[in-house]
């Protein structure tokens, strides 16, 4: 006799694993399916920035979502570390957003004014003051915003911790098990099918398939408007003296990491599912990093890699019920902030599944905002 699992989650990245963690912690029977290894795609490629100011232009629903998730990490980190036995390398390093051209100062002022209602600490620095914080910054830096609360975490460790803790609470993980179809009764999914021909009965289906979420459209008959966006990233050995803060400038960032490394990221490219590195992408990263911090010119290269972000048309996630389905929930399209949004997404989707009601914070992120009819 076929057993039935309470919730099947399609996608074993940081979002799927976070949802599994919050559900299983509440006693829900969960199974997570991934087309590859658990956490092997964008979640492990990510830099792990917990820096909410950058994606925001001011207050609003997206700011509420990001800042709420950001505020969960100080308590979530020790909880996850204890439940999983994995250290997350969570650090409140603070971030500097710098400009090198005096003509850009007014725009930086405007950004700071727009961010002030968000409630995060910010300090305006002159170029000299910025170099006091980071002596290796370019001599031509003329102004900066310092946000001391912005933080970072080791992304690959976070997804491992979510998955290990969820497994300890009873979640079953199926790697290399791509879900390729469903069985339905009226407007409910009753079973899911894998590429290997296996069948699993479930009471609820959650789609958290990252850049591959649009592939679910054909069997849900719901348009999920997500495309992959390639990000190229590299790491360098730290210069001397080492960098201590996250540095944002000229559409790139530098992030000091354990092991005496600095991560430089990241390109944003529409390249389909092509994950290869390009000479142009790596050259842009290196040139920008050296413009911001000239001492990096002599730093040995460490590694280079890519990841595929799941991007929606408005660069905000899709959270909530799938239209015309009673027991299908979407948690997709987190773009470049999946690590930062993992906490609130896991908590919110678990609450939705358990209580049957969409939490207020998720209302603005319904798929229905796009109103795209399904095309087979």
Language-model-detected regions and their locations in the chain:
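N-terminal Rossmann-like FAD-binding beta1-loop-alpha1 element of flavoenzymes
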Residues: 5-31
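Conserved Rossmann-like nucleotide-cofactor binding loop
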Residues: 15, 38, 212
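Active-site substrate-recognition segment that forms the wall
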Residues: 21-26, 35, 48-50, 54, ...
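Dinucleotide-binding Rossmann-like beta1-alpha1 core, especially the glycine-rich loop
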Residues: 48-129, 133, 288-290
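Short beta-strand to alpha-helix junction loop
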Residues: 64, 98-107, 146-164, 276-280, ...
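Helical element adjacent to the flavin cofactor pocket in flavoenzyme catalytic cores
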Residues: 145-196, 200-204
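C-terminal catalytic lobe of FAD-dependent flavoproteins
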Residues: 293-376
């Amino acid at each position: 006799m076929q057993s039935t699992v309470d919730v099947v989650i399609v996608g074993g990245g940081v979002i799927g694993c976070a949802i599994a963690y919050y559900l299983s912690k509440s006693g829900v029977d969960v199974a997570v399916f991934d087309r590859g290894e658990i956490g092997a795609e964008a979640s492990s490629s990510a830099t792990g920035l917990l820096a909410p100011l950058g994606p925001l232009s001011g207050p609003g629903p997206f700011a509420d979502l990001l800042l709420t998730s950001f505020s969960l990490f100080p308590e979530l980190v020790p909880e996850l570390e204890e439940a999983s036995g994995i250290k997350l390398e969570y650090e409140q390093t603070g971030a500097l957003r710098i400009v090198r051209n005096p003509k850009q100062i007014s725009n930086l002022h405007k950004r700071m004014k727009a961010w002030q209602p968000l409630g995060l600490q910010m300090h305006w620095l002159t170029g000299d003051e910025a170099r006091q914080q980071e002596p290796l910054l370019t001599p031509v830096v003329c102004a900066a915003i310092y946000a001391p609360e912005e933080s970072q975490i080791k992304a690959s460790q976070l997804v491992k911790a979510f998955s290990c803790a969820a497994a300890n609470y009873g979640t079953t993980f199926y790697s290399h098990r791509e879900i390729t179809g469903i069985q339905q009764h009226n407007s409910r999914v009753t079973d899911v099918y894998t590429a290997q021909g296996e069948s699993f009965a479930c009471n609820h289906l959650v789609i958290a398939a990252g850049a591959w979420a649009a592939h679910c459209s054909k069997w849900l008959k719901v348009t999920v408007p997500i495309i992959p966006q390639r990000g190229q990233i590299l790491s360098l050995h730290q210069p001397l003296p080492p960098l201590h803060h996250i540095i944002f400038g000229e559409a790139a960032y530098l992030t000091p990491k354990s092991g005496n490394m600095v991560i430089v990221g990241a390109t944003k490219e529409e390249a389909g599912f092509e994950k290869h590195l390009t000479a142009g992408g790596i050259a842009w990263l290196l040139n920008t990093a050296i413009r911001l911090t000239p001492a990096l010119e002599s730093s040995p290269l460490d590694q280079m890699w890519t990841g595929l972000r799941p991007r929606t048309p408005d660069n905000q996630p899709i959270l909530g019920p799938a239209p015309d389905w009673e027991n299908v929930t979407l948690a997709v399209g987190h773009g470049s902030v999946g690590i930062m949004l993992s906490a609130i997404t896991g908590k919110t989707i678990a609450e939705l599944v358990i209580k049957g009601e969409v939490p207020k914070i998720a209302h603005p992120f319904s798929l229905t905002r796009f109103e795209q009819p399904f095309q087979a």
